[in-house]
């Protein structure tokens, strides 16, 4: 370090050298300051003033940016949410007591996935750190794609939740990316082998912050040993991951990264849960977006999402649990029915449900409160919130024990009853902490009187000091006879007795001179000196003792962290169940039936979101699908008629059913669905340089490669992003492929404007045609929103254009062009599946592009164009009966000229 740098700047550079890729918040008195390039970054991102102070290593003026220490909760989240890592370098000793330069050191590193402060994330969402481990596994065969064995872990240090799984994935990492979409981590850490894999790292970066991190271990075996040491267990078998090497490795990577950034052991992370993808319906990022499960497409908020419709939970734990349920619908009919039994019971018992929801409304975020307690960054207000939450639980427990029958509700009641210390912990906090404590835990004022005798005495000394001084002053006036005598205080000389020079002859002999002034003398007595020592140290001692008592309370609560976290989980589950019952009753939902066959039967189904937003009532529709005759539903009809809404509502009803929710229908029976695939909507992926059509084909490829007979596929307007012939050919091939896949086919809803596809109903036995009914009233088009059997051969495009507000001149011209095309009798040949012969029908969907192609080169779907000659056109318009001989002769000359 250069001699021109101050000792404090030397400390700053030492911290920066230790954390080169991290912004440094360096505590200087009442400010956190940053220097050099960090200062420039912070000033820009936080929009604060950039100044300069001192010299850098080269002797130049050092850029400086700073924020008040008490405003860190305002500014820090803004940097973290932009993906920065921030190292907090604190003063490690009291500057007043420091000998020389104040000791400073980094006490924690805040990253997007390891934030603990509630200001940095939403109560309704988990803040996951994702860790990935894996290895490429070659497959035999010249053209075989390689696979990867992948382990993934998710850790939320704010709640203590810790999950891991392991699976085999393709070289495109579809399963891993689906997990990413479902869990939505704030940060992902990768070992170098995966970090340097462009196929993975770039796709991860598109959705989260990605860091390279390798834990300080030799391999999975050592990772397992360290996990066992952390959890204080002899084996990981009870956690389900004993032989899952990559899951174990990723789990330790997540925990080591979290403990390294927080610079402490995270004892509130006290269990690891292993889960399998085979337990849950798969909803990939495309499906989550298209169906707007937890956020909408418009602004990625939750308005008009399924989550928003269903989320009337009373607690943060309930909000988070509901989101997890929606992102991971169950595949087990038995487990789904456990949830449905509870929802049904709570629906049938409205008074019980009302009481439970009323009590739950007093429960705060127990999970995160406990996390902060164990972590050590909680304050007295957190303890008051925890106390109020615990006080609300005994009536919940007792009411459940007395009134419930269903399995899940009984498990919750028994679990709450097993927490024997619940009331004692609430009582301890109530006896110790004042009702409205200050935020700071180092300034006193948070412990109630009567909790600790020593503290009461110190507080009494401190609070009664003014009265004692007043009494002492009055006593000395009477003893000395000096009416103007006064007792004062300043920081330099402490307490003193002041006597003016005019009264100096009356000063008692036991007064000891302390200070001489121009017009007065200041004295003290042994009694005043002794009291001064008590007064000045009492407040300091009281504050220190309060903090000590507070710390003891935290330790007591920490000893029960596991029971508190389990209680929080039970309350979250109860909150979701009461919420689903409330929503079911308010929205007229019914209990669905779940089966292990492939049938889907929905009567009077409604879109759960749209029915809450439309005016004038929602038109319900039926859906009937099976594996024999109605496996592939081909839906035709005009734009805006409701095809997409119908398809989406079918999928949403199925998802709700497998979540364990009642559904918007009069009857519903759902054959378990393992994955919902969607190809709906059109947009360009500009970030990846992909056009609308390319995006469509990538999503379609994923569906065709991965859909199983247990899946549900929604396809909307496949092929519209390219030429008509290409689009039609692709659409037809897709229908045939899905219908014939694995000889049993795939359940699918396919909306299209290629009306020629409706002929496939006669060729493919499990394809069935449906269309959206419309009614024409003059030039007006009335959408009936009803899905009815059979096909339609009209798109009503011009009528829809009129409804959209297209200028009337354009509408009129479009009608003229349409009539002209119809007069020209543009025909196409399509294959009649009944007899294999060609039949002719009007090509209403492809007029504009058909002439771009050679009719004889259309891959079997030839288009024959019969254009009338100019002479034929004139002849058709003639009315021979009304023509005179002269007029007939003139017309004949005109026809001859046309022929020439």
UniProtKB/Swiss-Prot annotation:
Top-rank taxon, per record: Archaea
GO MF annotations, alphabetized: ATP binding; ATP-dependent DNA damage sensor activity; damaged DNA binding; mismatched DNA binding
Binding site for ATP: 637-644
Listed Gene3D superfamilies: 1.10.1420.10, 6.10.140.430, DNA repair protein MutS, domain I, MutS, connector domain, P-loop containing nucleotide triphosphate hydrolases
Keyword Cytoplasm included in the entry's annotation: no
Keywords: ATP-binding, DNA damage, DNA repair, DNA-binding, Nucleotide-binding
Pfam entry (one): MutS_V
InterPro entries named among the record's database cross-references: DNA_mismatch_repair_MutS, DNA_mismatch_repair_MutS-lik_N, DNA_mismatch_repair_MutS/MSH, DNA_mismatch_repair_MutS_C, DNA_mismatch_repair_MutS_clamp, DNA_mismatch_repair_MutS_core, DNA_mismatch_repair_MutS_N, DNA_mismatch_repair_MutS_sf
Coiled coil: none
GO biological process: mismatch repair
Sequence similarity: Belongs to the DNA mismatch repair MutS family.
The protein's role, per its UniProt record: This protein is involved in the repair of mismatches in DNA. It is possible that it carries out the mismatch recognition step. This protein has a weak ATPase activity.
NCBIfam families: mutS1, PRK05399.1
Record's protein name: DNA mismatch repair protein MutS
Source species taxonomy: Archaea, Methanobacteriati, Methanobacteriota, Stenosarchaea group, Methanomicrobia
């Amino acid at each position: 370090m250069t001699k021109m740098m101050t000792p404090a700047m030397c400390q700053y550079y030492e911290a920066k050298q230790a954390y080169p890729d991290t912004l440094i918040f360096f505590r200087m008195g009442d400010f956190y300051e940053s220097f050099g390039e960090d200062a420039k970054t912070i000033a820009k991102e936080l929009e604060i003033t950039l100044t300069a102070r001192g010299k850098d290593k080269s002797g130049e003026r050092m850029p400086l940016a700073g924020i008040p220490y008490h405003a860190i909760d305002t500014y820090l989240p803004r940097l973290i949410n932009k993906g920065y890592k921030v190292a907090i370098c604190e003063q490690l000793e009291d500057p007043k007591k420091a000998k020389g330069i104040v000791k400073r050191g980094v006490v924690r590193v805040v990253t997007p996935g390891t934030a603990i402060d509630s200001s940095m994330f939403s109560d309704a969402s988990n803040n996951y750190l994702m860790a990935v481990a894996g290895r490429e596994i070659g497959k035999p065969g010249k053209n075989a794609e390689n696979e990867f064995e992948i382990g993934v872990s998710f850790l939320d240090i704010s709640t203590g939740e810790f999950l891991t799984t392991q699976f085999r994935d393709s070289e495109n990492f579809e399963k891993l990316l689906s997990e990413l979409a479902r869990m939505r981590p704030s940060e992902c850490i990768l070992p170098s082998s995966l970090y340097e894999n462009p196929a993975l790292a770039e796709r991860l970066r598109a959705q989260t912050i990605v860091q390279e991190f390798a834990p300080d271990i030799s391999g999975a075996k050592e990772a397992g040993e360290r996990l066992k040491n952390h959890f204080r267990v002899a084996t990981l078998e009870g956690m389900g991951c004993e032989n899952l090497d990559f899951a174990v490795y990723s789990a330790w990577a997540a925990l080591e990264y979290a403990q390294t950034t927080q610079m402490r052991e995270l004892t509130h992370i006290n269990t690891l849960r292993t889960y399998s993808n085979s337990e849950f319906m798969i909803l990939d990022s495309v499906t989550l977006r298209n169906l707007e499960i937890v956020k909408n497409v418009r602004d990625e908020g939750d308005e008009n999402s399924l989550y928003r419709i269903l989320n009337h939970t009373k607690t943060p734990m309930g909000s988070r649990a509901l989101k997890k349920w929606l992102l991971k619908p169950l595949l087990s009919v038995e487990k789904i029915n456990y949830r449905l039994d509870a929802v049904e019971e709570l629906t049938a018992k409205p008074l019980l449900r009302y009481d439970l929801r009323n009590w739950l409304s007093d429960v705060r975020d127990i999970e995160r409160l406990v996390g902060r307690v164990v972590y050590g960054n909680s304050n007295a207000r957190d303890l008051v919130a925890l106390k109020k939450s615990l006080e609300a639980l005994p009536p919940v427990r007792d009411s459940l024990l007395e009134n419930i029958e269903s399995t899940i509700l009984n498990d919750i009641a028994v679990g709450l009853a097993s927490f024997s210390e619940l009331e004692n912990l609430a009582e301890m906090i109530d006896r110790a902490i004042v009702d409205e404590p200050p935020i700071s835990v180092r300034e006193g004022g948070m412990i109630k009187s009567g909790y600790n005798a020593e503290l009461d005495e110190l507080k009494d000394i401190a609070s009664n000091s003014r009265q004692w001084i007043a009494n002492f002053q009055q006593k000395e006036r009477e003893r000395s006879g000096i009416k103007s005598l006064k007792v004062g205080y300043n920081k330099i000389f402490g307490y003193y007795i002041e006597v003016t020079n005019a009264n100096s002859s009356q000063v008692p002999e036991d007064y000891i001179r302390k200070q001489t002034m121009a017009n007065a003398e200041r004295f003290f007595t042994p009694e005043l000196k002794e009291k001064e020592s008590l007064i000045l140290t009492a407040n300091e001692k009281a504050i220190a003792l309060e903090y000590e008592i507070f710390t003891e309370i935290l330790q007591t609560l920490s000893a029960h962290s596991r029971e508190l976290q389990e209680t929080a989980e039970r309350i979250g589950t109860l909150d979701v169940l009461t919420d689903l019952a409330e929503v079911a009753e308010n929205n007229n939902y019914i209990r669905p039936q779940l089966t292990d066959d492939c049938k889907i039967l929905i009567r009077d189904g409604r879109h759960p979101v749209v029915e809450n937003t439309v005016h004038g009532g929602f038109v319900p529709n039926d859906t009937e699908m099976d594996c024999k005759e109605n496996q592939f539903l081909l839906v035709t009809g005009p734009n805006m008629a409701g095809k997409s809404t119908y398809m989406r509502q079918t999928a949403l009803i199925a998802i709700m059913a497998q979540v364990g929710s009642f559904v918007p229908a009069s009857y519903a029976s759902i054959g378990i669905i393992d994955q919902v695939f969607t190809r709906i909507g059109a947009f360009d992926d500009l970030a990846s340089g992909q056009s609308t059509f390319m995006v469509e084909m990538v999503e379609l490829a994923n569906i065709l490669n991965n859909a199983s007979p247990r899946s549900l596929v929604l396809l909307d307007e496949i092929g519209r992003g390219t030429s008509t012939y290409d689009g039609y050919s692709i659409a037809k091939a897709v229908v045939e492929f899905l219908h014939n896949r694995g000889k049993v086919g795939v359940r699918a809803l396919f909306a299209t404007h290629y009306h020629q596809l409706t002929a496939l109903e006669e060729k493919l036995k499990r394809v069935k045609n449906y269309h959206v009914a419309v009614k024409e009233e003059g030039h007006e088009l009335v959408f009936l929103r009803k899905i009815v059997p059979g096909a339609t051969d009209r798109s009503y495009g011009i009528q829809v254009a009129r409804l959209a507000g297209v200028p009337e001149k354009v509408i009129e011209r479009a009608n003229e062009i349409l009539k002209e095309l119809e007069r020209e009798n543009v025909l196409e040949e399509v294959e009649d599946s009944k007899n294999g012969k060609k039949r002719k029908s009007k090509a209403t969907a492809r007029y504009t592009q058909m002439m771009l192609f050679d009719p004889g080169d259309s891959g079997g779907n030839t288009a024959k164009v019969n254009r009338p000659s100019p002479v034929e056109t004139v002849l058709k318009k003639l009315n021979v009966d009304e023509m005179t001989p002269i007029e007939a002769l003139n017309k004949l000359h005109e026809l001859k000229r046309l022929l020439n």
